[in-house]
Amino acid sequence: MKTIFRIAQTELRLFFYSPIAWLILIIFAFQAGMAFCDTFSYQLQNKALGRGQIPFQTVILLLGDSGSFFKVLNNLYLYIPLLTMALMSREYSSGSIKLLYSSPVTNFQIIGGKFLAMMLYGGLMLVILLLQVVFAFIFVKNLDIPLILSGLLGIYLVLCAYSAIGLFMSTLTSYQIVVAVGTLVILTCLNFVGGLWQDIPVVQEITWWLSLSGRAKTFTAGLICSEDVVYFGVVIGLFLTLSVLKLQSTKQHYSWWWRWARYGGMVCIALGIGYLTSKPMFMCYYDTTETEHNTITREGQRVMNLIDDQLTITMYVNLLDKSAPAGMPENQMSNLRELKPFLRFKPDTRLKYVYFYDSTDHSRFRGATASLPLREQMLKICDDEDLDPEFFLSPEEIHRQIDLTSEGNRMIYLLERANGRKSFLRFYDGMDIRPRETEITVALKRLVTDASRIVFLTGHGERSLYWNDKGGLYSLIQRNGR
């Protein structure tokens, strides 16, 4: 450990001997300060104009979409590659790497020392953000400190992940510009990989987990999830290990297939860990917000605890339904995200998808196309969207499984307990078609409680009891029983 600390100390000195480290700190402080001052001045203007005090000042000033932490987080990728591009490239170009190889220092110590230097530099960047926290603590009543600490943890983990990626890229070449560009390319790939191969089972879960996009926003929202912590740990560990392997292959001669086998093996191990830890049964959560904003309501928790047997949630997707694109395989992980707050309290819940085509009162087609036979409509959509027709059950096949005619054969969730109790959870018309916490809780509650007797008053302008539009909110029964 002493050797690692010495290397880190030397690396920090080299950082601050050049103007880049100082310049980055100054620009970072200026950017973070301007973001904070803009939001703070807007709140002062509201107060001066008599608009009253807006609640949730912790989120508005620091962690919300207009907060300084959020804006800083979106720009971190601009700073870290400028620092990491010289970590190992400088050793290659100056020839000092030969001195390191001939000295009694291991490859792990070299990589560990340089990464520790980046961790310490990242700590200096957090100190700048802590100054804003101190200022907010003075002027904001009841500041949510645990929420802020969660946000700072997320930012720091992103800094460390970017540093590990940049360090690995710097071991590949002596050209610093190539390292910086390569780091940006890797970061871009990690941000967009979550949208790749989402129509392939298992692979969709791996690429979704591998995506870096939005990881830190979970922390800034105040929710610390073991999946996200493990993700950053695996990414950091993977790229540091790849860096050590690269130095070993430089010192010792290995055949090309053995080098690639070692790299591939480490990547497979990392993906395997990620796949396992992304399963709900292996997840742990800690909601740091004072109001438990990231946790379902107490009533929702009570309902989930009452379901003491196997719960199965099946999504029935009618290809001819307007809402069908939201239920296609490429959107399965997005749908899982909506259910995740409930799966937190019952991680053994089974999720299933059934795809079919049938007549519906919510059809994609209008005019002459809508009069075509159902199979021809299905084939037309499959041809337009490059889908396999054999993937969808025919009307006769789906009718043998379930009768959805009472729901207009629309896309719908079926919630089913092992004791046989069932409940439908609908999708709706409009911009936001997915059911939210209130609607999900109501559907789950029907699995654990008997139907109540409801009396309606009519004849005084009330909404109609008999309106039967499943996707609308025009009738009172649809509004309260979504």
Language-model-derived ranges and their functions:
Residues 1-25:
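Aromatic- and glycine-rich beta-strand/loop motifs that create alpha-glucan
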Residues 19-44, 71-80, 185-189:
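Hydrophobic alpha-helical transmembrane segments of multi-pass membrane transport/permease proteins
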Residues 34-37, 55-74, 112-174:
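Secretory targeting signals
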Residues 39-63, 172, 179-180, 185-252:
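Terminal transmembrane helical anchor/hairpin motif
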Residues 44, 199, 217-220, 226, ...:
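Short, surface-exposed patches at the edges or C-terminal ends of soluble domains, predominantly
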Residues 64-90:
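Long, hydrophobic alpha-helical segments
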Residues 81-101, 115:
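Transmembrane helix boundary and interhelical loop/hinge segments in multi-pass membrane proteins
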